[in-house]
Amino acid sequence: METHIKTVEFERPDMLSEAQSGASCVAHAWAKVPPVLSREERDELKARIKRLLKEREAVLVAHYYVDADLQDLAEETGGCVSDSLEMARFGRDHSAKTLIVAGVRFMGETAKILSPEKTVLMPDLDATCSLDLGCPPDEFAAFCDAHPDRTVVVYANTSAAVKARADWMVTSSIGLKIVQHLHAQGKKILWAPDRHLGSYIQKQTGADMLMWQGSCLVHDEFKGVELDLLRAEHPNAKILVHPESPESVVAQADVVGSTSQLIAAAQSLSAQEFIVATDNGILHKMRMAAPGKRFIEAPTAGNAATCKSCAHCPWMAMNALTNLAEVLETGRNEIHVDPAIGRQAVVCIDRMLDFAAREKATVRPQGDLAANAQLFQGIGPA
């Protein structure tokens, strides 16, 4: 089946709306990453944040890719460390009226869409996502309008405005089943924005998919040739790969899965060494889940090559103790979603959740994908 592609570069300033300005370029994002603090400064800030969370009756929900201190704080204060949709579902179901989302902007938007009555704050509103930036709402709407015969399926890593144009939102755990379901009905699909995940699903299902060519800055930089060389140096290591990675990397994986599933694999498999092809923020949780095991970052640069992210998202790195404390003190950086857009966007999210409930599946964002190797059989959803 031929795959058609729509391309938009995520770093072109002229492609960005006013709402998407700020740290849209990678260099700008890295420049906004707060400085490293001493242990004494970190301890003081953590104590202050714990006090402020109680005073505000707020709960902290954090992604696996943010700073380890923020992940620990979320768990220590009764919050959540997880994938983006689970973060939003946790926030929706929690009694707190204020949600502090440590992650990137689309995660805050999804939390607000699912909890419109709650206040959603983020440490830095400029913390965005290359997949989100690479799929501007106006361009995407025009693309959809040009192909009215196709069912629009979008990945969770998109803006509220893009979700508002979609028939389905998917995570990778349920994405395969949803695309199989649509394919069985004879539906032709318009997929956005991640080309690697879309290509993987297309090959698994044989569906007719018209694809937008977006990519995650972090995962797109993993190198297949260098990964093969690294594996030769560590022949007993198992390779854990996030499905937003290039095909040459996915093809070498022992386990393909989401952040949660990769953590589960690291904990459950008997191997003592793992090569990990996803954001290195996940290594904090992996080491906690599998103490004593060794985790090696998959290569992001080869001969004469450089990396922009070097296995860590610059926008995730913008979340820090300093701006988290400031947001709790000031109440600034509130996420707002136009109510009309929110009402439209929630339709595709609820459609996925209803489908998942019927399938009795556990749904998580950022690519909960069944592994492509027998090594992972018997390991349940994380």
Curated annotation (Swiss-Prot):
Keyword Metal-binding listed: yes
UniProt entry keywords in alphabetical sequence: 4Fe-4S, Cytoplasm, Iron, Iron-sulfur, Metal-binding, Pyridine nucleotide biosynthesis, Transferase
Highest taxon listed in the record's lineage: Bacteria
Residue sites binding [4Fe-4S] cluster per the record: C129, C216, C313
Record's subcellular location: Cytoplasm
Main location: cytoplasm
InterPro entries: NadA, NadA_sf, Quinolinate_synth_A_type1
Protein name: Quinolinate synthase
Gene Ontology terms: cellular component: cytosol
Cofactor: [4Fe-4S] cluster
Its biological purpose: Catalyzes the condensation of iminoaspartate with dihydroxyacetone phosphate to form quinolinate.
Listed GO MF terms: 4 iron, 4 sulfur cluster binding; metal ion binding; quinolinate synthetase A activity
Cofactor binding note: Binds 1 [4Fe-4S] cluster per subunit.
Pathway annotation from the record: Cofactor biosynthesis; NAD(+) biosynthesis; quinolinate from iminoaspartate: step 1/1
Family membership: Belongs to the quinolinate synthase family. Type 1 subfamily.
Encoding gene per record: nadA
Pfam families (UniProt xref): NadA
Record has Phosphoprotein as a keyword: no
Catalytic activity: iminosuccinate + dihydroxyacetone phosphate = quinolinate + phosphate + 2 H2O + H(+)
Gene Ontology BP annotations: 'de novo' NAD biosynthetic process from L-aspartate
